[in-house]
């Protein structure tokens, strides 16, 4: 079973005849260097959230592929303050001896674990403000569900977007209803569309997450998802290879009735074709 951790984040821009550094697509790394003059690193944070797909509002099982950590397995402990998590994340980057580490002066504070807008508004304000006010944080990025962007949350994000750029990362995964039902996404495509429009109207940048290789999906299905999001007013897309993680219901399904998991070559091929659908 192939379980690569590879992904590609594409910053969506109009296609032209030039190369973006050494790539033929506009990568997030290229965009950040163009904006800030050097590499920007993401620090994963855990705000102590849960998810309506876990607490019983929608379901109690979570999305079928989601780990016990709510996809925040690389975040620091939620028992630490946000500032402490940022400082720990900085030390991890230094410890890895990343290239051009002397330039590490700006970070993306990324609320990654569970649903990053699913909490009382006062708590969200406190968490986000602590992150965005950190002197070395350049961008506040929040992973969330499209159905967890109530008007008061949108107003808060708009307010913070005046201090530093705010990104919202939406877990769409697929546009196909049958797939959405299987992975227990818990909301229809129309909710995603409305969330993107609401964020766009407020000048908040949106990154859409898509999983390539979901069970039952063909190459044409994946390309249809890529084509759909390419026509939305979003600024980026993260193409993620399907992970079959131990302890998830997806892993149980795989053990009981193994499904095809993309090989590295298949993933590379479909990823290239998806990128070609970007504007």
Model-derived regions: residue spans:
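Conserved C-terminal portion of the radical SAM core fold
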Residues: 190-249, 265-279
């Amino acid at each position: 079973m192939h379980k690569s951790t590879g992904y590609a984040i594409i910053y969506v821009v109009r296609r032209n005849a030039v190369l973006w550094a050494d790539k033929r697509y506009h990568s997030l790394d290229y965009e950040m260097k163009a904006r800030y003059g050097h590499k920007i690193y993401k620090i994963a944070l855990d705000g102590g959230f849960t998810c309506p797909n876990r607490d019983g509002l929608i379901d109690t099982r979570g999305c079928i592929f989601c780990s016990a950590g709510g996809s925040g397995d690389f975040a620091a402990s939620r028992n630490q303050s946000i500032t402490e998590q940022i400082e720990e994340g900085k030390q991890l980057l230094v410890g890895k001896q990343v290239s051009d580490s002397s330039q590490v002066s700006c970070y993306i504070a990324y609320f990654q674990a569970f649903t990053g807008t699913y909490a009382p508004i006062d708590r969200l304000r406190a968490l986000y403000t602590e992150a965005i006010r950190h002197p070395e944080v350049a961008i506040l990025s929040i992973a969330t569900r499209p159905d967890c962007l109530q008007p008061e949350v949108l107003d808060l994000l708009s307010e913070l977007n005046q201090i530093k750029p705010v990104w919202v990362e939406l877990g769409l995964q697929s546009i196909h209803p049958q797939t959405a039902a299987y992975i227990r996404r818990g909301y229809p495509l129309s909710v995603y569309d409305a969330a993107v429009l609401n964020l766009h109207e407020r000048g908040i940048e949106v990154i859409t997450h898509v999983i390539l290789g979901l069970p039952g999906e063909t190459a044409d299905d994946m390309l249809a998802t890529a084509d759909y999001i390419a026509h939305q007013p979003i600024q980026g897309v993260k193409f993620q290879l399907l992970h079959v993680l131990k302890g998830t219901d997806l892993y149980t399904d795989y053990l009981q009735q193994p499904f095809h998991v993309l090989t590295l070559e298949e993933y590379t091929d479909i990823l290239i074709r998806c990128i070609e659908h970007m504007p």
